[in-house]
Amino acid sequence: MSTKDLEASMRKSLEATQRNFNTIRTGRANSSLLDRISVEYYGADTPLKSLATLSTPDSQTIQIQPFDISGLAAIEKAIAMSELGFTPNNDGKVIRINVPPLTEERRKEFCKMASKYAEEGKVALRNLRRDAIDKVKKQEKDGDFSEDQSRDEQDSVQKVLDKFIVELEKQLADKEAAILKV
């Protein structure tokens, strides 16, 4: 595995962690908060995004405009049952969610959730490093690399990992700052 391939894999892992971060509330309304919500629609779990248009008319409101009005009740139920703690307001045509300001306790909970996502991201990055180092060791064993070349490759793999860990830590710090900002 070349370092470019490794970097591409690690970049994808980092992007997945960033998507997880985007599902955590900050003080502002953001339609990506609803990305993980699935709605039981005609007997199948369907992502909310494929059933409705999501918008944020102001910093404290998320508006959901279903493509099919008959799905309004199912969407409302899915949002109410989610762990986000939102109370949807259904006016018969659209659903509005007022995003209340976060309490200090909720902010701390969300910081813990962000830390958990960051740790999962680090584990994924370390697994990619392990796989890359295993391939290098196999190449050394097969005679494709000398011991010195193998060590150099392993060092370069570690440097790539270190770079991505620093980037992930920065993303975590940014997310925690956004969560704690009042």
UniProtKB/Swiss-Prot annotation:
Taxonomically, the superkingdom here is Bacteria
Listed GO biological process terms: translational termination
Q: Name one GO cellular component term.
A: cytoplasm
Q: Which Gene Ontology molecular-function terms are recorded?
A: ribosomal large subunit binding
Q: Which UniProt keywords apply?
A: Cytoplasm, Protein biosynthesis
| Record's function text | Responsible for the release of ribosomes from messenger RNA at the termination of protein biosynthesis. May increase the efficiency of translation by recycling ribosomes from one round of translation to another.
The entry sums up its family as follows: Belongs to the RRF family.
The cross-references to HAMAP family, in alphabetical order and at most eight, read:
RRF
Protein name (database record):
Ribosome-recycling factor
